[in-house]
Curated annotation (Swiss-Prot):
<keyword id="KW-0812">Transmembrane</keyword>
<dbReference type="GO" id="GO:0009523">
    <property type="term" value="C:photosystem II"/>
</dbReference>
<dbReference type="GO" id="GO:0015979">
    <property type="term" value="P:photosynthesis"/>
</dbReference>
<keyword id="KW-1133">Transmembrane helix</keyword>
<dbReference type="GO" id="GO:0030145">
    <property type="term" value="F:manganese ion binding"/>
</dbReference>
<keyword id="KW-0472">Membrane</keyword>
<comment type="function">
    <text>Loosely associated component of the core of photosystem II (PSII), it is not always seen in crystals. PSII is a light-driven water plastoquinone oxidoreductase, using light energy to abstract electrons from H(2)O, generating a proton gradient subsequently used for ATP formation.</text>
</comment>
<comment type="similarity">
    <text>Belongs to the PsbY family.</text>
</comment>
<dbReference type="GO" id="GO:0031676">
    <property type="term" value="C:plasma membrane-derived thylakoid membrane"/>
</dbReference>
<keyword id="KW-0602">Photosynthesis</keyword>
<keyword id="KW-0604">Photosystem II</keyword>
<comment type="subunit">
    <text>PSII is composed of 1 copy each of membrane proteins PsbA, PsbB, PsbC, PsbD, PsbE, PsbF, PsbH, PsbI, PsbJ, PsbK, PsbL, PsbM, PsbT, PsbX, PsbY, PsbZ, Psb30/Ycf12, peripheral proteins PsbO, CyanoQ (PsbQ), PsbU, PsbV and a large number of cofactors. It forms dimeric complexes.</text>
</comment>
<feature type="transmembrane region" description="Helical">
    <location>
        <begin position="5"/>
        <end position="23"/>
    </location>
</feature>
<dbReference type="InterPro" id="IPR009388">
    <property type="entry name" value="PSII_PsbY"/>
</dbReference>
<dbReference type="Pfam" id="PF06298">
    <property type="entry name" value="PsbY"/>
</dbReference>
<keyword id="KW-0793">Thylakoid</keyword>
<protein>
    <recommendedName>
        <fullName>Photosystem II reaction center protein Y</fullName>
    </recommendedName>
</protein>
Length: 39
């Protein structure tokens, strides 16, 4: 692996992981709210 590849991909992977984490957390909250309404 070339260090320049890591320099370019590192921030992109961090941003993608952070976005995915936030999307998953929001989706879980929505699902929990849905089940709470159904109960």
């Amino acid at each position: 692996m070339d260090w320049r590849v890591l320099v370019v991909l590192g921030p992109i992977l961090i941003a993608a992981g952070w976005a995915g984490f936030n999307i998953a957390a929001a989706a879980i909250r929505q699902v929990q709210g849905f089940f709470n309404k159904e109960a």
